[in-house]
Regions:
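Catalytic-core helical/loop segments in enzymes performing group transfer/polymerization on anionic/lipid-linked
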Residues: 1-212
Length: 212
């Protein structure tokens, strides 16, 4: 929410991400810089992918009072995988922190915790939630076989895997760093449950190995 700065210098974005950033920051004058560069004198803000800003860049931005725009995939990203270079339909742009980073607050977190919501907006959000569930909309919207709950009354627990080098593990789950450790922790917490393990779609597609 809000107006993006007029002059934004973006660091370390690959060419295909540059194309998307131009769309999402339409109205801002964008200049793309190498990862090890520093903002020029006309910059009003710097943009980086996730938590990849180098310490020197962060220090320079703070010293000059420049806004830091941290960019990441949105929760409803695309029809297809980002690792397969499918263009996104949503990105998150946050000036405070990343939603997956448990070590720092984010604009999204603050907005949800302290914001006030008109009844009409709450009703719209609920209608959208119902529509997403009914139409089985997911982050990547990949085709797949249907799943049926196992027979009986046994508790079923979904265990969602991740690419183990992903920043969400580094900053969001300091006590669990591998998918195997995650499964072991869930089994210890749910000894009688039926566990369903869902590997990350990038791993299933062969675009990343689990530990990459």
């Amino acid at each position: 929410q809000g107006v993006h700065p007029q002059r934004v210098e973006a660091f370390g974005f690959t060419p295909w991400k540059q194309r998307s950033l131009k769309r999402f920051l339409a109205g801002s004058a964008l200049r793309f810089r190498l990862p090890r560069g520093l903002p020029g004198p006309q910059a009003e803000a710097v943009a980086v992918w996730g938590r990849r800003a180098r310490p020197r860049l962060l220090a320079t931005a703070r010293q000059r009072g420049l806004s830091l725009l941290q960019v990441e995939d949105g929760f409803l990203r695309s029809v297809g995988l980002g690792a397969d270079l499918v263009d996104p339909i949503s990105w998150v742009v946050d000036q405070r922190g990343m939603y997956y980073d448990a070590t720092a607050a984010s604009d999204l977190e603050q907005r949800l915790a302290t914001g006030t919501w008109p009844e009409a907006q709450l009703a719209r959000a609920e209608a959208l939630r119902q529509q997403l569930v009914e139409q089985a909309i997911t982050k990547y919207n990949l085709p797949g076989a249907g799943w049926q709950r196992p027979a009986g009354n046994r508790r079923v627990v979904l265990v969602v895997g991740q690419v183990e080098s992903d920043a969400s593990i580094r900053y969001g789950a300091p006590g669990v760093s591998t998918n195997l450790a995650l499964l072991e922790a869930v089994r210890a917490a749910e000894p009688e449950a039926f566990l369903v393990y869902k590997p990350h779609p990038d791993v299933v597609a062969g675009l990343c190995r689990s530990g990459e």
